Every structure is written in structure tokens, then in C-alpha cells.
């Protein structure tokens, strides 16, 4: 029998991330590189470690190999524990065949046995594809104080963007009275962040109920949460005010990387009290040549810079040759940029080779972002 845990986290990391185009052709979205040395999933795993959540089940499905290799036994996030720690939970085969996860609720339902072994009081459900720093222990305290059945973390979004999100309509006490999935005419701008805390008994009961319903799409937002509301359960909205970014598109991924270069950013990677952990790439120090010029940029280990880099994020092992300019761009691990190249407002994928004299910038709309990656 596993050691009893007060709260167990379940991290949904099986997303395809199709809006990221070629970046996720052979890679699960949570494994996409971010911020010069991280992967998207590092933020959620680091939040767990910093919040004192010591038992994390990671549910994978789409293109899982590189993500599995990256996570390993969880030692990068201090989650390699004798009891608990990180457990990767891909779909598994039964006598009737492989049981694929058909939705977010289905993924958790198929792993109820994993949760049961810990006899948790609470289950924290997370998404592995957002960029943010959050103390989950404060949300758990709120959930307990409010005597909620379910608590959902929400963030205020601009009204003109509210129709892109699952929106929570609440009363004055922040109790959720209605949940609307991407409403055309939203009545609130409190968007669900896809972070839920359930009382374990409630979660188990309603996932089993959802699984028995042949009409259900087995999704928390579309099926389980509306059912809980219909049956009068107490759902509380937990307001979050920090930095949070859904990096589900090429442009939003680029924007989040550019946010790291601001003088005043609420996503401070230098915060010693809330570190973001990652797997060390074991590269040599970066080299900046005498004639190179670097301004307002994040340059990671193993880079060789002989040209100009301005307001950009370069991952490990990137080469920028003489006469080249990289401006307002993100260059992913191992990319080689030849001589006299101009790259502006672009994301260059991992291991890409940009030939001498190439010019890459938005052609029509100057606000666009260009993606150069395998398969494009």
C-alpha cells in the first residue's frame, strides 16, 4: 500500500497542440521548448515542487517518447521520491484492447486506481501546457476554508478575448453559478485556467457517473463541471492575479518568450524563492565573438554568437555566424544560422539550418510571426 497523501496532483500532458503547427509534429505540446532553457511542462512541475505537492501523476498520450525521456524519474524537480514522486501514466492495454484517453475526464477516470492507492483527501488537476507560477498550497487552503466540493482557478481576461475561454459566472462570494464554454456573448470575464481541486470522494463519484453516460464527451469543462452544478454541488472560483499565458498558438508562444525580455515582467525567472527547474543540457558556456553584438537577449549555454542578436531568446547550442542579425525572435536548440542572414519576428525550430543570405521576416502583416521548422 502506498503512503497516504493529503493531496495528489494529476497533470494532463497528452495534448497534441495542433495550433503550434510543425513544432508539435513529433513532439507533445508540454515538451515544446520555452524561455531559452525550459520546456513548457517545467512550469507546472516546478509549481508542484515549490508548493509542496510531492505526488504527481503525469498523463501522456500524443507523441510521448521525448516527454517521457525528459521527465525521467522526476529528479530535476526534486520529485524522485521513495513514496509518491512522479509517475508517468500513458494509456494502457486491457484484454479488449488499448484504452485511449478520449477526453480530460476520461484520462483521470482511467487512472482512478492510481489515485486510490494514496487515499487522498484532495486531487489537484493540472494542465501541462500553460506558462505561469502559482502556489497550489494557497489554492488548497482556499478550497478547504470555503468548504467547496470543487475549486477552479480563474483569471480575468480582456472582455474581447473572453469568448475564447471557458467562462465562470459567479455570485458575490465567488461561488460559481454557471459555466459557459467559449460563449459568444460572455457575461463574465473570469476564465478557467484548467486548474481544479476536487474532494476525492466527489471526483471519484462523478467520474464514474460520467463514464456510464454514452452521450458524454468525457471532458471536465463540457460534461463533468456542468453536471456538478446541475446537482447543486459547491463550486468555488479561486481568483489568480499573476502572469498566466496559454501558449497554444505560434504567436502566443512567441509573445510569452518576448515577455521574458521586458524590464518589468511578472514572470521573473530570477526569483530565488520560486525557481523554475529544468533538465540540465550539459552544454559548454556560450561564446560571444569580439565583433558580435548582443542586446536585451537571453543566450543559453553552448551558443556561439558571431553576428548580432537583439531582443531575442536563443536556446542551447545555437550558432549565429558572422554578418547575421537575429531580431525579436526565438531560436530553438541546436539551430544553425549561416552568414549574412536576417531573421526578424520569427520562431526557428530545433536543429534547423538557415542557409547563408536567407531573409526571414513577416511578408504581409508586420504583426505576424514566422515559423521556420521541420515539416513547414
Swiss-Prot record:
Chain residues that bind alpha-D-glucose 1-phosphate: 101, 166, 181-182, 192
Entry-linked CDD domains: ADP_Glucose_PP, LbH_G1P_AT_C
Keywords (A to Z) from UniProt: ATP-binding, Carbohydrate metabolism, Glycogen biosynthesis, Glycogen metabolism, Nucleotide-binding, Nucleotidyltransferase, Transferase
Lineage top rank: taxon: Bacteria
The protein's annotated pathway: Glycan biosynthesis; glycogen biosynthesis
InterPro entries in the record: ADP-Glc_PPase, ADP_Glu_pyroP_CS, GlgC_bac, GlmU/GlgC-like_hexapep, NTP_transferase_dom, Nucleotide-diphossugar_trans, Trimer_LpxA-like_sf
GO BP annotations listed: glycogen biosynthetic process
Catalytic activity, reaction form: alpha-D-glucose 1-phosphate + ATP + H(+) = ADP-alpha-D-glucose + diphosphate
Enzyme class, first EC level, given as a word: transferase
Listed HAMAP family: GlgC (MF_00624)
Family: Belongs to the bacterial/plant glucose-1-phosphate adenylyltransferase family.
Protein's UniProt name: Glucose-1-phosphate adenylyltransferase
Species for this entry: Bacillus anthracis
Gene: glgC
Amino acid at each position: 500500500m502506498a503512503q497516504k497523501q493529503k493531496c495528489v496532483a494529476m497533470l494532463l500532458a497528452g495534448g497534441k497542440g495542433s495550433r503550434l503547427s510543425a513544432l508539435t509534429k513529433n513532439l507533445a505540446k508540454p515538451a515544446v521548448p520555452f524561455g531559452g532553457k525550459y520546456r513548457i511542462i517545467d512550469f507546472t512541475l516546478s509549481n508542484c515542487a515549490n508548493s509542496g505537492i510531492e505526488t504527481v501523476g503525469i498523463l501522456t498520450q500524443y507523441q510521448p517518447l521525448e516527454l517521457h525521456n525528459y521527465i525521467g524519474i522526476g529528479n530535476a524537480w526534486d520529485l524522485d521520491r521513495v513514496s509518491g514522486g512522479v509517475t508517468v501514466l500513458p494509456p494502457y492495454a486491457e484484454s479488449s484492447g488499448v484504452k485511449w484517453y478520449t477526453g480530460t475526464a476520461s484520462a483521470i477516470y482511467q487512472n482512478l486506481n492510481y489515485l486510490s492507492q494514496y487515499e487522498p483527501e484532495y486531487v489537484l488537476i493540472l494542465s501541462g501546457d500553460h506558462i505561469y507560477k502559482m502556489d497550489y498550497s494557497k489554492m488548497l487552503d482556499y478550497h478547504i476554508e470555503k468548504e467547496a466540493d470543487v475549486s477552479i482557478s480563474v483569471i480575468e481576461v480582456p472582455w474581447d478575448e473572453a469568448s475564447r475561454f471557458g467562462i465562470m459566472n459567479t455570485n458575490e462570494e465567488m461561488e460559481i453559478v454557471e459555466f459557459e464554454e467559449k460563449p459568444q456573448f460572455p457575461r463574465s470575464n473570469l476564465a478557467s485556467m484548467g486548474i481544479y481541486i476536487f474532494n476525492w470522494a466527489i471526483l471519484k463519484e462523478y467520474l464514474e457517473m460520467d463514464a456510464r453516460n454514452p452521450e458524454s464527451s468525457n471532458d471536465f469543462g463540457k460534461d463533468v463541471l456542468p453536471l456538478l452544478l446541475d446537482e447543486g454541488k459547491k463550486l468555488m472560483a479561486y481568483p489568480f492575479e499573476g502572469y498566466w499565458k496559454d501558449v497554444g498558438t505560434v504567436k502566443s508562444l512567441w509573445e510569452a518568450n518576448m515577455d521574458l525580455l521586458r524590464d518589468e515582467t511578472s514572470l521573473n525567472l530570477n526569483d530565488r524563492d520560486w525557481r523554475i527547474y529544468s533538465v540540465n543540457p550539459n552544454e559548454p558556456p556560450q561564446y560571444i565573438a569580439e565583433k558580435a553584438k548582443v542586446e536585451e537577449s537571453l543566450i543559453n549555454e553552448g551558443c556561439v554568437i558571431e553576428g548580432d542578436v537583439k531582443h531575442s531568446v536563443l536556446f542551447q547550442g545555437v550558432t549565429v555566424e558572422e554578418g547575421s542579425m537575429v531580431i525579436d525572435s526565438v531560436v530553438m536548440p541546436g539551430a544553425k544560422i549561416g552568414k549574412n542572414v536576417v531573421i526578424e519576428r520569427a520562431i526557428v525550430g530545433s536543429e534547423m539550418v538557415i542557409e547563408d543570405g536567407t531573409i526571414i521576416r513577416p511578408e504581409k502583416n508586420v504583426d505576424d510571426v514566422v515559423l521556420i521548422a521541420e515539416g513547414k
